[in-house]
Amino acid sequence: VLLDVVAALAIVALAAFVLMPRPRSSIGAAELSGEAVRVSGEFRKGRAKALTTGSVADVRVDPGNKRIQVDGANPISIRDGVAMNWVTSDRCPIRGGTRALRFLADGRSCGGVMTPSASGREIELRVDWLTGRVEMSPK
């Protein structure tokens, strides 16, 4: 009888081990999209600040440390596993060793393209220099 109980418990333990969900080591499409939405929100926050204050507002992008910060606000950190590629024009100011995205009082910007990527997926965030509009599209 004891052997039957031990065998039954072993079978239940084996089934639980096989059926338990395992944490993923890679970033999925939904997580990458969520990070892209957070970054685009910071860009939009910078534009809104420039429009409401009537003065320039810089959004500092630090791809090496994976941090983004609107002037006067707390920085956000991009989660581990997400790489950032940041390209701007030469007209964008250098802040903290990298080019910042500058929004002018009328909403225009110096323009830039941020590409967060993970697990072979990329999402392109394009900030139009003329309108300051932020567009997000899979690459």
Identify the residue ranges that each predicted region occupies.
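N-terminal helix-rich module
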Residues: 9, 14, 18-139
